[in-house]
């Protein structure tokens, strides 16, 4: 077994906590909630905000959406891999007479990124429904930092516990990269939100 684990039960527990609380949880800061909010915001804006500039702004949201999908998939795989490693270790412990309870595993299904979006219309058009799209984008933006904080609780434990193994270092690099770019993601969403407000103020309905 090409893995080194300090605490089998600890790895199992943190894997499930990461998956249930930070990846798939129903809290405002879970990856799935952030992704769903941005997806709703994108779809709303596509239907009610037209023009080249609108297309650029919507594409900016898609860029952040895809980054969230990618890190969500990485974290889901990390949780699944960690749970399987813990389960395998437990089987070995029990084969040696430990008599401990078997450990369950996680199956994580990836979400799909969105294709690029372009609006070539010269005429600008926007409806009041854009405010609903803005609200969804703001909701996601408000919770990116909370998402990172929640992930870090369990992610750091997993990294300190599972010290050697295939896939570990890739997950570590991916999360550190997302974390380092999170300020830019937040600034991007704030800029889009501000542009929606300006467009609504300037447009004559």
Where do the PLM segments sit?
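N-terminal secretion-targeting helices of virulence/extracellular proteins
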Residues: 1-205
């Amino acid at each position: 077994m090409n893995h080194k684990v300090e605490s089998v039960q600890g790895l199992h527990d943190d894997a499930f906590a990461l998956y249930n609380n930070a990846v798939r949880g129903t809290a405002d800061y879970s990856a799935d909630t952030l992704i769903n909010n941005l997806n709703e915001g994108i779809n709303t804006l596509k239907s009610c905000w037209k023009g080249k500039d609108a297309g650029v702004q919507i594409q900016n949201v898609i860029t952040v959406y895809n980054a969230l999908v990618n890190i969500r998939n990485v974290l889901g795989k990390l949780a699944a891999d960690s749970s399987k490693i813990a389960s395998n270790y437990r089987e070995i412990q029990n084969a040696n007479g430990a008599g401990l309870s078997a450990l369950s595993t996680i199956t994580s299904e990836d979400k799909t990124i969105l294709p690029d979006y372009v609006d070539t219309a010269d005429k600008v058009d926007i409806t009041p429904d854009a405010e609903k799209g803005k609200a969804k984008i703001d909701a996601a933006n408000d919770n990116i930092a909370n998402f990172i904080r929640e992930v870090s609780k369990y992610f750091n434990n997993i990294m300190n516990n599972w010290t050697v193994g295939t896939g570990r270092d890739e997950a570590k690099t991916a999360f550190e990269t997302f974390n380092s770019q999170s300020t830019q993601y937040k600034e991007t969403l704030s800029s889009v939100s501000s542009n929606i407000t300006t467009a609504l103020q300037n447009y004559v309905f």
